[in-house]
Amino acid sequence: MKNVHNTIDEARLGIMLNDLRLPTIKTLWPQFAEQADREGWPAARFLSAIAEHELAERAHRRIERHLAEAHLPPGKTLESFAFDAVPMVSKAQVMAIAAGDSWLAKGANILLFGPPGGGKSHLAAAIGLALIENGWRVLFTRTTDLVQKLQVARRELQLESAIAKLDKFDLLILDDLAYVTKDQAETSVLFELISARYERRSIMITANQPFGEWNRVFPDPAMTLAAVDRLVHHATIFEMNVESYRRRSAMEAKRHRGRPAAFATTKSASLIVAERQSEHDETLASDNQHDTFMPTAT
């Protein structure tokens, strides 16, 4: 009879845990209850143990959801970023930024400038990934893609609503700002986005052109000045003026392609010469020894 009551109680408990949306506790409580009985845990320790696992699993699922919605390019991490190739970027400063905290709470911005291939997008995505792992929400998008979506929203009289929906992201990463066409319709929705997030939600921008060339993006000088003013206020700026990583890799591969075997060895040229000279000397010595003991003809 006792087993029947236990079975009914366990079934009811499972239903209640489902209603309370506690799937991890529902899965783990039997094994923790057995351990608690075996080791004589007080009730508080038992409840604390299963609650801790529930919270940890919720945090894990939340990070997975945030990673899925962020659309980050794969494989871009701070661990794989070549800080030594971009000496003007402080690794310590980047690590502090990747923690989030105060600058995101203030709606501050991060601006990354430099020629194509210098690692701007990699660094932006890597910071975004670290922020998600620290509990923040991030969206990574090509600037042109987002601008086109906002233009559609404007035509449907939904621009304000579309911009408001982006407020759920603590950080909006706009990649390749320079590729926005110099068109009043496109740049105006971009300006409205920048204005709406000013001092409220953070923006990170990667761009090939410095501010002095932003008249190529914003056709209206007054709009250019206003956009720059809002972005620079409370901003951290990285000037990544280095040679393209892709170009460096291609040139390195070209230098190594088709080299003779001698150039592929790890031995130095002087060591190779010395070894060849030694082999030559040994050959001469062997020939001399052979000549000495050769019997003379009669």
From Swiss-Prot:
ATP binds at G114, P115, P116, G117, G118, G119, K120, S121. It holds the Pfam family IstB_IS21. The keyword Glycoprotein does not apply. One of its GO terms (biological process) is DNA replication. Keywords: ATP-binding, Nucleotide-binding, Plasmid, Transposable element. Residues 276-298 are annotated as: Disordered. SUPFAM superfamilies: P-loop containing nucleoside triphosphate hydrolases. Coiled coil: none annotated. Belongs to the IS21/IS1162 putative ATP-binding protein family. This is Putative insertion sequence ATP-binding protein y4iQ/y4nD/y4sD. It comes from Sinorhizobium fredii (strain NBRC 101917 / NGR234).
